[in-house]
Amino acid sequence: MTGAAAWHGLPRFRPTTHLHYGALLASLATLWRRHGALRRATLSQGLLAIGFSAFWSTLAVMLHGAPFHLGSGAAGAFGLAGAAGALAAPLAGRLADRKGPELVTRFGALLAVVSFAAMALAPMLDVHGQLVLLVASAIGFDLGFQGMLISHQTIVYGIEPGARSRLNAVLFTGMFIGMAAGSALGALVFAQWGWMAVVVLATGSAVSALMVRMMRGR
């Protein structure tokens, strides 16, 4: 029933290209080689995704141990704090229209850097202070991540209007690669060196994303 309702209710769009599926996939590599703006957007979003995923994939394990001794429900509650990033989408879109997406991407990356780096202060605080810091940091870097993503989409959509879906596919592929790498790296460094190593990894990924956004040209 859901499928039937979608079939009848969703709008119909004419395809913007007559390429067959194999040619569409091959064209992704062509778009990557052709457009430096696409490479910068994909690389910076993918780098930031490493820290984003490293944090969320290790948070529950960290909260389960000392000094918090919290269950998985507490980690799930942190997701509500992270959901605040969804509020950044319309704001980032409006700012990108008014100030330009380049400025918003840099601000988003800088916000993520500050939010990740702030977690290094946790050992100086008591347990409740550490939890407050974690919540504030989660809200901050999620706002930065979502703001960068919306602005990157604005950038890539303006590159070649007839290939927007394919440009978006390249952007999200880079982001998902970063998330997969962040999950693996986060688990590795947490097991070897603990939570502060995850903080260093996340901060480094955000700094790298900011450096890419500060680069000119290619």
What residues fall within each predicted segment?
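C-terminal membrane-cytosol helix-exit motif in multi-pass small-molecule transporters
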Residues: M1-T16, V212-R216
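A late C-terminal transmembrane helix in Major Facilitator Superfamily
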Residues: G158-W195, L201-S205
